[in-house]
């Protein structure tokens, strides 16, 4: 199992797209949206957990404390049921950063991909994005995520990847491919990168 997460607006969708190109399975086509999210897992599991503890289901404000996470029996079975059967299953959701201990316990063998982006670029992207409206201080919001990243590094089988680095140099994805047991497809990465869109807007950084 592969989990992809990071701050929203970091490029998690782009990195997940690359994982799909490398052969990862995201679920039945009718359950996966244009952001490479398995909507069934997101709506029925991730958002349900957040709402159970009165946290924002969009992962904006308020954020949950890791100490408040509820027990969620059957989490592994539920996730796998919504994903279906496929080689190299993967699930991407920026909100996994807020719930990672639950998914670590349910999937102790999982490989994690932590997507990174410059803090100021994330803040600017949040301020330009119509649905990012609940938080008044995006800088503090990014800091809250980065505090969680520190614990994730210590407790998860995790690799970090900076989206801008992959945009500039496809070989920067090699650490992700190796970590996830995939053969690096440089040509596939090059064909997936639209440099004009990345620098002009947040098309690839939508979550």
For the regions a language model picked out, list residue spans one by one.
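Short, surface-exposed acidic
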Residues: 27-31, 138, 180-192
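C-terminal accessory extensions appended to soluble enzyme cores
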Residues: 185-207
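A basic- and aromatic-enriched beta-loop-alpha substructure that forms the phosphate/nucleotide-
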Residues: 58-91, 116
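Exposed alpha-helical structural elements
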Residues: 44-48, 71-78, 137, 175, ...
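PAPS-dependent sulfotransferase catalytic domain
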Residues: 80-185
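Low-complexity, flexible helical/coil segments
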Residues: 40-42, 63-64, 124-130, 147-155, ...
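A periodicity- and composition-biased signal for non-globular, repetitive helical segments
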Residues: 15, 98, 122-123, 202, ...
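PAPS-dependent sulfotransferase catalytic core
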Residues: 1-74, 195-201
């Amino acid at each position: 199992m592969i989990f992809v997460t990071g701050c929203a607006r970091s490029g998690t969708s782009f990195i997940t797209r690359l994982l799909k190109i490398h052969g990862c399975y995201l679920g039945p086509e009718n359950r996966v949206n244009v952001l490479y999210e398995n909507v069934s897992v997101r709506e029925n599991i991730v958002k349900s957990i957040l709402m159970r503890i009165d946290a924002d289901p969009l992962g904006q404000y308020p954020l949950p404390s890791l100490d408040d996470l509820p027990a969620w029996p059957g989490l592994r079975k539920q996730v796998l049921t919504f994903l279906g059967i496929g080689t190299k299953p993967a699930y991407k959701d920026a909100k996994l950063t807020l719930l990672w201990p639950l998914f670590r316990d349910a999937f102790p063998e999982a490989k994690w991909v932590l997507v990174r982006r410059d803090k100021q670029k994330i803040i600017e992207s949040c301020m330009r994005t119509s649905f990012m409206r609940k938080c008044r201080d995006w800088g503090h919001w990014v800091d809250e995520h980065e505090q969680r990243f520190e614990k994730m590094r210590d407790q998860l089988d995790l690799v970090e990847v900076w989206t801008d680095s992959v945009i500039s140099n496809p070989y920067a994805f090699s650490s992700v491919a190796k970590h996830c047991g995939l053969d690096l497809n440089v040509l596939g990465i090059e064909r997936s990168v639209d440099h004009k869109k990345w620098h002009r807007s947040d098309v690839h950084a939508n979550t």
